[in-house]
């Protein structure tokens, strides 16, 4: 679009990185997108997806429920994607918390038109751009002042109802839920209400392939099975890359969308680091890696709720994953995407956060590693069979991915798939896309965008292109196919 000849070197055999799916015995396990921010017009990310050819002709599912959280005594919190319905449900569940519930619903409504500035990179802002952004944010200052440093756990403590207090902290279906920024939750539910954050039918890999197709159509080149070992540097200027096979490829500019730690400390030998950059990797928390259990089941689950992120419920018999006992499990039924399994069959997913070091050590003994994955699959199937009698006999496919799986395919530090952990501290943190003392080198992706996600990683790459265009005194151009 902007006159640059580019080529991508990818260590995997397919596009997408963490935005991926994989096939197992006639089933497709989706490993990434629960929803896509900007899935329909009216949301600021939508034009960006249009530029990439990612949304044209694509069907999106807008769920009625974001999540379900069940209690031990039969209580159920349904996080409806419709704000009015969510408010009514919460009031029925805990009428004594009327004031707090109404405040919560009001805060979601207040974020419906929140403007996410994605059209222009902050690094190329001029004075007028800054004034324009400030004026757009002005109506939201009171919300940011009130909730900017508040976590879901902080807000949950205001509920009198004990079940609601517990369930609210699990409503984002993350085990670090209590520490999740309340603002991020408010914005997400506002998008859900406006139906601008749907699930892309076909799954994550097909979504990534549409972007690959757009890139190739524009003349780009992609080299798969091409792991970069070193960034070539001459006189403090990036001049190309050396692959693991020893071949070298020269260039005027190098952009790394690879793992941040690997890029900085291995590919560049840690030579271009200051205290700020070092501090990120020494002190910032990384999102916990996961054990991802995918099952192919000859069952339609027609009576099971279709949700964005799954149903979280207590277990009669705890499951031990990564050496830690779990008394709850979150399960997602993908019967809303007919492309992932044949008619009457369903992909079922259970995901657990875990400890990287546990799996790294276990991986050194292949037999024990394999046996542990089988044991976890057995326990998940048994737990599901207690909830859905007869399910165990209907399981046709089992697949367990661990942090070592994610590390092997993506190179991500500690096997994480989200990068930096999203928190009230990192939510508004900005990281430089360059390294001190190194010219013609840029970084893009989740390691320079705290909180991760496909939209922010995509925006990151677009922003780097704008930065380069400004450096080269060119007008940035973005077209739609």
Over which residues does each language-model region extend?
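Short loop/edge segments at beta-strand edges and connector loops
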Residues: 62, 224-226
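Active-site-proximal substrate-binding core of FAD-dependent oxidoreductases
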Residues: 233, 469-481
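A glycine-rich dinucleotide-binding beta-alpha-beta segment and adjacent secondary-structure elements
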Residues: 161-175, 326, 330, 386, ...
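Active-site/ligand-binding neighborhood in enzyme catalytic cores
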Residues: 109-218, 225, 409-424
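A conserved FAD-binding loop/helix module that cradles the flavin
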Residues: 33, 446-469
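Mid-domain catalytic core of redox enzymes
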Residues: 199, 229-342
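N-terminal glycine-rich phosphate/pyrophosphate-binding loop and immediately adjacent elements
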Residues: 1-113
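C-terminal segments that line or cap access tunnels to active or ligand-binding sites in enzymes
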Residues: 298-404
């Amino acid at each position: 679009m902007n006159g640059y000849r580019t080529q991508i070197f990818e260590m995997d055999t397919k596009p997408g990185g963490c935005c991926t799916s994989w096939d197992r015995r006639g089933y497709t396990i989706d490993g990434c997108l629960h929803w896509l921010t900007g899935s329909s017009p009216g949301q600021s990310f939508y034009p960006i997806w249009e530029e990439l050819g990612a949304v044209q002709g694509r069907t999106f599912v807008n769920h009625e429920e974001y999540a379900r959280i069940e209690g031990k005594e039969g209580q159920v919190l349904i996080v409806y994607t419709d704000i009015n319905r969510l408010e009514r449900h919460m009031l029925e569940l805990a009428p004594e918390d009327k004031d707090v519930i109404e405040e919560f619903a009001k805060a979601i409504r207040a974020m419906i038109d929140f403007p996410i500035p994605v059209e222009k990179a902050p690094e190329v802002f001029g004075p007028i751009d800054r004034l324009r952004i400030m004026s757009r944010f002005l109506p939201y200052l009171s919300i940011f002042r009130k909730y900017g440093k508040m976590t879901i756990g902080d807000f949950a403590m205001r509920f009198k109802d004990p079940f609601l207090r517990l369930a609210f902290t699990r409503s984002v279906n993350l085990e670090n839920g209590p520490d999740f920024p309340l603002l991020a939750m408010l914005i997400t539910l506002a998008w859900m209400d406006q139906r601008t954050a749907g699930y892309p039918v076909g799954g994550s890999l097909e979504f990534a392939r549409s972007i690959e197709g757009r890139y190739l159509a524009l003349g780009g080149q992609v080299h798969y099975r091409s792991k970069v070992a070193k960034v070539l540097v001459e006189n403090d200027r990036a001049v190309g890359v050396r692959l693991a096979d020893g071949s070298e490829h020269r260039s005027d500019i190098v952009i790394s969308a690879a793992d941040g730690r690997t890029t900085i400390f291995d590919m560049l030998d840690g030579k271009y680091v200051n205290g700020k950059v070092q501090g990120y990797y020494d002190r910032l928390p990384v999102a916990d890696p996961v054990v991802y259990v995918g099952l192919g089941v000859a069952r339609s689950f027609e009576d099971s709720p279709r949700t964005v992120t799954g149903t979280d419920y207590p277990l009669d018999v705890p499951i031990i994953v990564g050496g830690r006992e779990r008394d709850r499990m979150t399960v997602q039924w993908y019967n809303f995407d007919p492309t992932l399994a044949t008619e009457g069959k369903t992909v079922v997913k259970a995901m657990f956060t875990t400890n990287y070091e546990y799996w790294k050590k276990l991986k050194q003994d292949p037999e024990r590693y394999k046996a542990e994955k089988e044991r976890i699959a057995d326990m998940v199937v048994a737990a599901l069979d207690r909830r859905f009698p007869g399910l165990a006999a209907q399981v046709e496919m089992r697949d367990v991915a661990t942090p070592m799986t994610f590390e092997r395919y993506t190179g991500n530090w500690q096997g994480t798939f989200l990068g930096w952990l999203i928190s009230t501290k990192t939510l508004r943190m900005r990281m430089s896309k360059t390294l001190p003392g190194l010219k013609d080198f840029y970084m893009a992706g989740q390691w320079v965008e705290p909180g991760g996600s496909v939209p922010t990683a995509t925006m990151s790459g677009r922003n780097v292109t704008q930065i380069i265009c400004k450096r080269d005194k060119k007008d940035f151009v973005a077209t739609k196919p």
